[in-house]
Swiss-Prot record:
UniProt protein name: Glyceraldehyde-3-phosphate dehydrogenase
GO cellular component: cytoplasm
Residues reported to bind D-glyceraldehyde 3-phosphate: 141-143, 196-197
Main location: cytoplasm
Positions with a binding annotation for NAD(+): 13-14, 112, 170, 302
GO MF: 4-hydroxy-tetrahydrodipicolinate reductase; glyceraldehyde-3-phosphate dehydrogenase (NAD+) (phosphorylating) activity; glyceraldehyde-3-phosphate dehydrogenase (NADP+) (phosphorylating) activity; NAD binding; NADP binding
Lineage per the UniProt record: Archaea, Methanobacteriati, Methanobacteriota, Archaeoglobi, Archaeoglobales
Assembly and interaction partners: Homotetramer.
Gene that encodes the chain: gap
Any one GO BP annotation for this protein: glycolytic process
Active site: 142 (nucleophile)
Keyword Cytoplasm: yes
Length: 340
């Protein structure tokens, strides 16, 4: 079987993880990655993958730094069947207009891009089939991925009504040193809704959801607190049972020491490379029912949760596998599933 040739444009927080995940699959391979600047990530990336320069005008910088490059993004794209764009917010749309459309290449974009950059916004559990055969797909953001997975499982197993979700957002990724929030809690935005609810509706258009969001001075994970109106009587144990059937949702317990996101990440450091958590991390004790309202609290590792979604999007776009088969293969390759 011919493997799908994948280019990664942007070998950063998401890009390097997607590259490594692609390398674990038996039906796709990395043909090259790009960097804009000759920094330490570029030096390490060049040791693992063919390295190309994302901005052709920066070639001389790489040469002066002594980093071996194979060319520019314009040299890479003809060697690939698809490009996974992991550029900063809004740069993906620029790359589409400047490079991808001209090269006639399929492309996957990340959640920082506007929805109209692609033909479909994607989550493997919720709408895999909508991406089948498409040329441009947008994998929704880390927060939206976490919300969508959980809501999809709830609406698949129960009759649900209005959803209210509060997003407690990490302020920046751990490596960022140019911005942040050292002391304070920032409503983001102050007015409702935050963008997360409308973004969920790009994947699950029939969901009634409103979200608010706050930035907190932490870098480890996001936390979501959901209140879901249930249209039928339900017990907490029924929800626990339903969620436990989905490998991409990990149920944890405070009784086991998971008392904060710090403890969750410490667990992840023992579990996987780069302490990556691809799953929604749901506190079992947080699942509770009060009248018609279901409450759930989950944590989302923003650096990793979208990685399996990118892999499944590639399979859908090239019609390599049906939904269940793709998700199974991705889960097995990344070690997603029962941990305890």
């Amino acid at each position: 079987m011919m493997k799908v040739k994948v280019a990664i444009n942007g070998y950063g927080t998401i890009g390097k993880r997607v590259a490594d995940a692609v390398s674990l699959q038996d039906d796709m391979e990395v043909v090259g990655v790009t960097k804009t600047r000759p920094d330490f990530e570029a030096k390490l990336g060049a040791k693992r993958y063919p390295l190309y320069v994302a901005k052709p005008e920066n070639v001389e910088l790489f040469e002066r730094a002594g980093i071996e490059i194979q060319g520019t993004i314009e040299d890479l794209l003809p060697k690939a069947d698809i490009v996974v764009d992991c550029s900063p917010n809004k740069v993906g749309a620029e790359n589409k207009a400047k490079y991808y459309e001209k090269a006639g290449i399929k492309a996957i974009f990340q959640g920082g891009e506007k929805k109209d950059v692609a033909e479909v916004s994607f989550n493997a559990l919720a709408n895999y089939d909508e991406a089948v055969g498409k040329s441009y797909v947008r994998v929704v953001s880390c927060n939206t991925t976490g919300l969508t997975r959980l809501i999809y499982m709830l609406k698949t197993n129960f009759s649900i009504g209005r959803i209210r979700a509060t997003m407690l957002r990490r302020v920046v990724d751990p490596k960022e040193d140019k911005k942040g929030l050292v002391n304070g809690i920032m409503p983001d935005p102050v007015a409702i809704p935050s963008h997360h609810g409308p973004d969920v509706k790009t994947v699950l258009p029939d969901v009634d959801i409103v979200t608010t969001a706050f930035k907190l001075p932490t870098t480890l994970m996001h936390v979501h607190s959901l209140c879901v109106e249930m249209r039928e009587a339900v017990k907490a144990e029924d929800v626990v049972s339903a969620l436990s059937e989905e490998p991409r949702i990990m149920l944890i317990s405070a009784e086991d020491g998971f008392t904060s996101t710090a403890k969750v990440i410490e667990f992840a450091r023992e579990l996987r490379l780069r302490y990556d958590l691809y799953e929604n991390i749901v506190w079992r004790e947080s699942i509770g029912v009060d009248g018609n309202d279901l409450f759930v609290t989950q944590a989302v590792h923003q650096e990793a949760i979208v990685v399996p979604e990118n892999i499944d999007a590639i399979r859908a776009m090239f019609e390599l596998a049906e939904k269940e088969e793709s998700i199974r293969k991705t889960n097995e390759s990344l070690g997603i599933g029962k941990v305890f």
